[in-house]
Amino acid sequence: GIHGSPTAVMAFEGATGWLVGPENRGMASMFTMMNNARLAVGAQGVGLAEAAWQHAMHYAMDRKQGRTPRGPGAIIDHADVRRMLAEARAEIFAARAITLACGLAINLSHATNAPHWEARAALLTPIAKAHATDIGCEVTSLGVQVHGGMGFVEETGAAQFYRDVRITPIYEGTNGIQAMDLVGRKLSDGGESAFRLLQEIEDHAEHAHTTLPTLTGDVWEAAETLRETTEWMLAAEATDRAAGAVPYLRAFARVLGGHYHLRAAMADPSGPRARLARVFVDRILPEHETLCLRARA
């Protein structure tokens, strides 16, 4: 269970209930209250993923087992362990970047009162909460996998990260609710805020093409596929949108992850950021296509 939480059963009996906001608008009012909490839970997912990754990395560098093509050595020299650690690192970077972009949009909306930033913050909030916590669960699970059987030995601490993070896709609105919020309330502007963000992604990919031609094409094409899926969502019946909401949110997060990795790579085209971006674009970003197909199914 979750420790240190004030969650409890409360019996109000004959207490008077007061409406929150106008009649039939209570949910919208509640989401206004929850926005900061949703972003904070996303940050919790990122933090636990980072802690689990560092824990797994140290173990992989220390644990000697088996033989690699280079002879006996630590398990970090095994190809699949290296793959898990590299993909987890790329996932954490993307989830952190989405969370930071959401926080920046919230700050700018407060500082400027500009409708553009208010819309951007609203669009990114459900994505940041849902995706960062999903990635938290996936990366902490990978951390256990890197440890092998030792991951189930309590003293290693690997499983604790997973137990701690598993609540995050549930509270402050389940991730399914976040996805419903995205395809419902956040696309209710006719997709204007989503299309504006996708245009920024495509424009940046075109700008970066001369410097990083092997990365930019994939990012641009992913944004275009998501644009087409967004158009489908806007034209679909409400039940069809709801059925495709979860894969749509994840596809959106994949495209955003590719965009932020590309921006980081542009700041260091021959350094580690560019190599990490290559991992994401080659191994993780392609998921967006299947996710978009599932969203439209």
Which ranges hold each PLM region?
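C-terminal amphipathic alpha-helical interaction region
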Residues: 189, 200-297
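Internal glycine-rich alpha/beta core junctions
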Residues: 1-225
